[in-house]
Amino acid sequence: MNMSEPLINKVAASGIITLNPEDYYPKEEMAVFDLKDYLFMGLILKEKDFREALKNQDWDKYKGRHVAVTCSADAIIPVWAYMLAASYLEPVAGEIVMGDEKELQKKLFLKNISTIDPADFADKRVVVKGCGETPIGDYVYMEITRLLRPVAKSIMYGEPCSTVPIFKKK
C-alpha cells in the first residue's frame, strides 16, 4: 500500500445502517406489587381482608411507574385478585403486567421496539448490533428481524466490520 493514498473507511462507505437494540431498552421506573404480602399465613387469600388492605394501600407510590403484579409465594391465587389489584393500579400506574419484573421489562422492551418505523429501513442493509453494555434478550433480536425482514435489503447480526448474515432479499 502506498502511504500517500488516503485511507478509505469501507464500512462507512458501505451504506450499512446499524440498529442498536440498547437504544430501545426500557429506562422507565418499574415496581413490583407482590400479592404474597396479603396472604393469611403466607398461603391463603381472604377476600374481605384483601379488599380492605387494597382499599387502604398507598397507591401513589406507583404513580407513573410500570408495575408487575405477581405472587412470589407458592399459593393458589384466584383470578379476581389480580383483577382487583389492576383496578387500583390502572388510574396511577403506567403499564401493568401480570408476572415478575422480567416479564414487565420484556413487555416494555417489545413495546419500544414496536416504535421502529420499518419504512426507515426499506431497501437498506441493516446490522443489528450484537455486543453492548446491556444484556439483551433473544426475543428482542427475533422481534427486530420479524419487523425488518419484509422491507430491508439485508439483515446482519454483529458489528459492521464483522457480521453474521441473517437475511438477504433476492
Question: Where are these predicted regions, by residue range?
Answer:
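N-terminal, charge-rich interaction modules
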Residues: M1-I76, A86, A93, V151-S154, ...
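Short, non-transmembrane amphipathic alpha-helical segments
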Residues: Y82-E90, V140-R149
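Gly/Ser/Thr-rich loops at beta-strand to alpha-helix junctions
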Residues: S72-V79, C131-Y139, S162
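A domain-level signal for the structural core that forms small-molecule/cofactor-binding pockets
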Residues: L54-K55, I96, S114, G130, ...
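Long, charge-dense
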Residues: A81-D120, G158-T163
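Short glycine-rich or small-residue beta-strand-to-loop segments that form or flank ligand, phosphate
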Residues: H66-S72, V97-G99, R125-C131
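Extended, charge-rich low-complexity interaction segments
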Residues: P118-M142
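Short acidic, glycine/serine/threonine-rich loops at helix termini
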Residues: L108, Y139-Y141, F167-K170
